[in-house]
Each structure stands twice: as C-alpha cells, then as structure tokens.
Amino acid sequence: MYSSEHSEFILSPLVDLLKNGLSACKGTGDGIESFPLCEYVTQSLFLKLTGAQEQKIKCICWDLATVDYEYRYEFLNNKNYGECSNWNSKNGVYNDLIRAIQKINSSFEPSQLFDAAFLTNILNEILQVYEKSILIIWLKRELCFYKANYSSIISARQIAQIKQPNSKVYPLFQSLLKDKFEEIVYNHRNRCAHNTLSYQINKPDFNAIAKEDYEYNSYFFRYTIIILIDSILMSLFNKYLSILPEKV
C-alpha cells in the first residue's frame, strides 16, 4: 500500500490524543481540590484536538497534491481552506478525498464506508473514554445530559449522505449536525485559540445561556464531533491509500 511521510500522522486517531490527555489526570485524584483543573484541562485538550485536526487536513491536501497535479493546481490557485478550521474547509477536504478515490474507482460512494455500525463503534469508544476518566467526576451533570441526548443530533442519517439533486458536493454532515459544529465547536475554537474569552463581549449572554439547547455547549459534544470528523477523514484517506498504486 502506498505510504507518504504524512500517512502515519493522518491515520493516528484523535481519540488516542483524548485518551492520553485524560490518562494524565489520573494522578490528580478526584477530590474537590482537583476541580479547579477542569476547565484548564478540558480547554487544553479541545485546542490540541482542533489543532491536530487542522494539521491533518493540511497534510491530506499536500498528499493529494503530491500525487495529482491537477489537484495541486486547483489547491494552490482556487481553493481557500485557510487554517482548515471552518466548516467549508472540512467539507471541502472530505469531497477532495472522495473525488480522488473516484478517479481510481468511479463506482465508489461514501455510503460504502459509513453506516450505522461505523457510527455506533465510534460513539461507543468515545463514551467509554468519558466514563473511565476524571470527567465523570468533574462534569457529571454534563455527561448525563450527553448520554441522554447525543443520539438526537448524531445519527447515521446525519453523516456522509448522498449528494442532493443538482449538487456537485457530498455533505459531510446534514444541516443539524453541521449547525452544531459551527455553534459549539468552531465558535468555541475561535474564542479559545484567539483568547477572546478574556473579553466579556465575546462570551454568551444570559439569554443564550438560558436557552434549552445551550446544554449542548459542552466539551463532551465538542470532542465527539471533532473525533467523528477525524474518523470519517481517516477512513477515506485509508481507502485512498489502499487503491493507490505503490509507485506513483
């Protein structure tokens, strides 16, 4: 199977980064004296996950551009993925991978890789990570809400669906999950990465906090959405490598 210098990094699951970060907290104990660490640890892990995902996407683009000169021209001249942090960049690279696979195997459809079992395995693994970590102590109420409600926004119908009629792109997520990404992942990423949480005007106001669906703004949902995107992109990249000639 073809391999590049980026392959190992791209195929390293972000869920392992989450596991390692939470494992590092085991020595802190679970008494009340550990609670001040909660926001620092969860925010630091969030930034590590978003940063790693952005670097992965850049590496995927470079690997595609190394093999496909037409894609290289398109990537360098017409695509504007920036830091690869927003929705358009993630959905764009998702489609770039699909098109790269379809150039070799024209019958390929993403539904061949992504089904209910694929999603169930990911969600079960993530939930096990949460339940075996200090988060079950620090964020017990938020975890209970997550367990009771994650299936309402994260389902097989929300990921990797077929193209809509007259559309040229495949949707990575349907509108419900896409909106959640932008609301609870991307917006929070910008607050944390640019340190705008230090400005009161950038914080959610009381009206936003009082809304019934504000409880989705938790690190449990943020981590899950990031890891779900990562798992989808890894599966596509692995499929791409498996059908690419060893010498290109």
Regions found by a protein language model. Give the residues of each.
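Charged alpha-helical initiation segments
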Residues: M1-L47, G51, K56-G82
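Polyanionic, low-complexity intrinsically disordered segments
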Residues: Y2-D16, N20-S23, W138-V248
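Intrinsic-disorder-associated interaction segments
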Residues: S3-S7, L11, F46, N86, ...
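Glutamate identity and glutamate-enriched acidic tracts
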Residues: E5-E8, E33, E39, E54, ...
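Generic hydrophobic secondary-structure signal
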Residues: F46-L49, Q53, I57-C61, E109, ...
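Helix-loop junctions and short alpha-helical segments
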Residues: C61-V169
